[in-house]
């Protein structure tokens, strides 16, 4: 499932427990990410899913659910 894969990438990138990550988690407010973390996270997602996320789309991604929805719409 996409959520589990995304959750594991986020946990690894941010060095946090995967159990803390929910679909509603905000990268900045809930998970403590800064703008550099988000750039690195987008790059990790692009590599893992073999896609390219345009900057205008990346700027709209604020929560874990946003990532899952974005990736689901690509399939």
Curated annotation (Swiss-Prot):
Pathway it works in: Lipid metabolism; fatty acid biosynthesis
Membership in a protein family: Belongs to the acyl carrier protein (ACP) family.
Gene Ontology terms, MF aspect: acyl binding; acyl carrier activity; phosphopantetheine binding
Keyword terms: Cytoplasm, Fatty acid biosynthesis, Fatty acid metabolism, Lipid biosynthesis, Lipid metabolism, Phosphopantetheine, Phosphoprotein
Subcellular location: Cytoplasm
UniProt record, GO biological process: lipid A biosynthetic process
InterPro entries: ACP, ACP-like_sf, PKS_PP-bd, PP-bd_ACP, Ppantetheine_attach_site
Species assigned in the record: Thermoanaerobacter pseudethanolicus (strain ATCC 33223 / 39E)
Limits of the Carrier domain: 1-75
Entry-linked Gene3D superfamilies: ACP-like (1.10.1200.10)
Modified residues (O-(pantetheine 4'-phosphoryl)serine): 35
Modification after translation, per record: 4'-phosphopantetheine is transferred from CoA to a specific serine of apo-ACP by AcpS. This modification is essential for activity because fatty acids are bound in thioester linkage to the sulfhydryl of the prosthetic group.
Name of the protein described by the UniProt record: Acyl carrier protein
One CC-aspect GO term: membrane
